[in-house]
Structure formats: structure tokens, C-alpha cells
């Protein structure tokens, strides 16, 4: 969560939506930086766990939903995160259309995925090859996002792809 918060420069003016939030670590990281944050996950059990371990409840909301169907109002988010979850999305195009819908003008998107090698199988394939990262960036551009960049970076010792961009103002 800290890497995502740094890469998107999250602060008190932000409303962060984390798609596929799991136990909510990154949602809490956003709240610690003063942002209001919503964790979205398809798993009610994960959301129960996230609620149970969250102390600062006033800045955080948990909702059941998927990337393709975000239960949030139009233009309500300034930042949307997908951290190691895009490879699980059923329909990336539909998910990006939903992200675009919930993002306010100038809103930022960040997707982080573990770097994987072409031809990897099993758990080693959970993530993106360089080509998959570039393909996701191209899809972001095709939905009207600007300043879309693909960066190679590290989350701890793990090499990750960071794809970020924003909506025009």
C-alpha cells in the first residue's frame, strides 16, 4: 500500500478506491495519509476481515463489488488502485470503463502487477509480462486516459510493473 500511495502521491484531498482490496492494507495506508478510502472486493469474507482489523473507521468504507461493476457514484474518486488484481479481472475493457466512470476529472489510476516471464505457469504466471503491461497501458489510453506510463519498480524485493495515468482535467 505504501508504494501505491507514493506513486499516486495520495494526500488529504484524495478519495481513493482500491479494487480487489482483500484485507485492506492499502486502504488503511491511504487513510493514514489523510485520504478518504473505499475498499472494493468481491469476497464478503475478505471485507469482514478488513473491517475487523481497521481501527480508524471514519475515513474508510468497505463495499462488495467487482472491477466490472463498481457500486460507486460517477466522478466520486480521485484515485483508483488495482494492486496485483488486474490479472484476475474477467473483462479488462469493462473494468476500465467503470474506472473511468467513477474517476473525477484529473483522477489518477494505478495498476501494480508482479513481473512475470512469458510462458510462466501456475503461481509464477500471476502477474504481467512486459508485453501485458504495455497492452494494459494501451487499453488505458484507448479509454481516454492521458500521461499513461509503464514503469518497472520494486515492492520490497519483488519486481513489479506499475502502470499509471490520469483522466484529462
Language-model region placement:
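Short glycine-centered segments of the SAM/dcSAM-binding site in methyltransferase folds
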Residues: 15, 107-108
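Class I SAM-dependent methyltransferase SAM/SAH-binding core
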Residues: 15-69
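C-terminal lobe and adjacent flexible extensions of AdoMet/dcAdoMet transferase-like proteins
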Residues: 163-169
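A short glycine-rich, Lys/Arg-flanked "PGG" loop and its adjoining helix->strand segment in the class I
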Residues: 93-105
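A conserved beta-strand element that flanks and buttresses the S-adenosyl-L-methionine
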Residues: 81
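Conserved alpha-helix/loop element of class I SAM-dependent methyltransferases that forms part
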Residues: 1-14
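A short His-aromatic
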Residues: 87-88
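C-terminal alpha-helical "lid/dimerization" subdomain adjacent to the S-adenosyl-L-methionine
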Residues: 108-163
Amino acid at each position: 500500500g505504501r508504494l501505491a500511495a507514493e506513486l499516486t502521491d495520495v494526500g488529504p484531498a484524495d478519495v481513493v478506491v482500491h479494487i480487489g482490496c482483500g484485507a485492506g492494507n492499502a486502504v488503511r495506508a491511504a487513510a493514514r495519509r489523510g485520504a478518504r478510502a473505499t475498499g472494493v472486493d468481491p469476497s464478503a469474507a475478505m471485507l469482514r476481515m478488513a473491517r475487523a482489523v481497521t481501527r480508524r473507521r471514519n475515513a474508510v468504507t468497505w463495499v462488495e463489488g467487482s472491477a466490472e461493476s463498481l457500486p460507486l457514484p460517477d466522478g466520486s474518486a480521485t484515485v483508483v488502485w488495482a494492486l496485483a488484481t488486474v490479472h484476475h479481472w474477467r473483462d479488462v475493457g469493462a473494468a476500465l470503463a467503470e474506472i473511468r466512470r467513477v474517476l473525477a476529472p484529473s483522477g489518477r489510476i494505478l495498476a501494480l502487477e508482479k513481473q512475470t516471464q512469458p510462458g510462466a505457469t501456475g503461481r509464477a504466471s500471476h502477474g504481467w509480462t512486459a508485453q501485458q503491461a504495455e497492452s494494459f497501458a494501451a487499453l488505458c489510453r484507448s479509454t481516454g486516459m492521458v500521461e499513461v506510463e509503464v514503469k518497472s519498480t520494486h515492492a520490497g524485493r519483488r519486481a513489479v510493473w506499475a502502470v499509471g495515468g490520469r483522466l484529462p482535467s
